[in-house]
C-alpha cells in the first residue's frame, strides 16, 4: 500500500488562546511548516496560525 500524499495538520493560534483549525496539506510539494492568517474568535482578530502535529 502506498503512502498518502496528503496529511492532516493542526493550525494553532500564535495568540496563545488554544484556538486551532484542522486542515490538510500535500506533504510532497509543500514541505515547509504552514502559516496562515485566520480569524481567532477568542481575541476577535485575525492572527497568524502555525502548523503543529495532531496528537
Curated annotation (Swiss-Prot):
NCBIfam families: PRK00595.1 (NF001860), rpmG_bact (TIGR01023). One of its GO terms (cellular component) is cytosolic large ribosomal subunit. GO terms for biological process: translation. Keywords: Ribonucleoprotein, Ribosomal protein. This is Large ribosomal subunit protein bL33. It comes from the Bacteria. One of its GO terms (molecular function) is structural constituent of ribosome. InterPro entries: Ribosomal_bL33, Ribosomal_bL33_CS, Ribosomal_bL33_sf, Ribosomal_zn-bd.
Amino acid at each position: 500500500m502506498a503512502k498518502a500524499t496528503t496529511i492532516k495538520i493542526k493550525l494553532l493560534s500564535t495568540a496563545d488562546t488554544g484556538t486551532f483549525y484542522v486542515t490538510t496539506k500535500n506533504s510532497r510539494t509543500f514541505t515547509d511548516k504552514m502559516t496562515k492568517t485566520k480569524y481567532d474568535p477568542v481575541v476577535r482578530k485575525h492572527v497568524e496560525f502555525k502548523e503543529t502535529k495532531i496528537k
